Design a protein with these regions (language model features):
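Conserved N-terminal beta1-alpha1 strand-loop-helix module at the mouth
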Residues: 1-88, 95-96, 103-130, 146-149, ...
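A short, polar/charged loop-to-alpha-helix boundary motif
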Residues: 96-99, 141
Length: 164
């Protein structure tokens, strides 16, 4: 799938802890119907516990996102991304070096990288990141280790990579 950055408007990140009575599939489809333009499968509980279940979930999500012509990214797992036919991966600063991720993915897959500083953003961009994930700007209960950044920090990150 060709990645058009201008089409990235709403980025849905999965977390089965928040699905309530809906299945992960149902919740993801609701997000797609609501206008999500990219989906990241980020299921921390399935990663190491049950690789086969995670692969099956990833294949279901791949079929669903294809139905809506929306890219699917896998959080931190290039092997799983390749196995399910995902459009790319998102890696955090403590997961895998962005340059290595780009090398393993190849030039035609989407690479997202978490960047919480200008230095991290510039490094990720130079190593082939297609987009950056920055934040949280506000406190959140969805990511326990997230420390809010100021709007000034976010603006500095955006300004540092915007013209490159």
């Amino acid at each position: 799938m060709k990645f058009d950055k201008s089409q990235l408007l709403i980025y849905a990140v999965t977390d089965r802890a928040w699905t309530g009575k809906m299945s992960l599939y149902e919740q993801t489809e609701a997000a797609l119907k609501g206008g999500a333009t990219m989906v990241q499968l980020r299921e921390k509980g399935l990663r190491d516990d049950n690789v086969e279940e995670y692969l099956e979930e990833a294949k279901k999500m791949r079929a669903l996102t294809e139905k809506y012509n929306v890219p699917l990214l896998i959080d931190d797992n290039i092997k799983l991304a390749k196995a399910c036919g995902a459009d790319g991966v998102h890696v955090g600063q403590n997961d895998m070096d962005a340059g290595l991720a780009r090398q393993l993915l190849g030039p035609d897959k989407i690479l997202g990288v978490t960047a919480k500083t200008v230095e991290q953003a510039l490094k990720a961009q130079s190593q082939g990141a297609d987009y950056l994930g920055s934040g949280a700007v506000f406190g959140t209960s969805t990511k326990k280790d997230a420390r809010p950044m100021t709007m000034e920090q976010l603006q500095a990150i955006c300004a540092s990579v915007r013209s490159r």
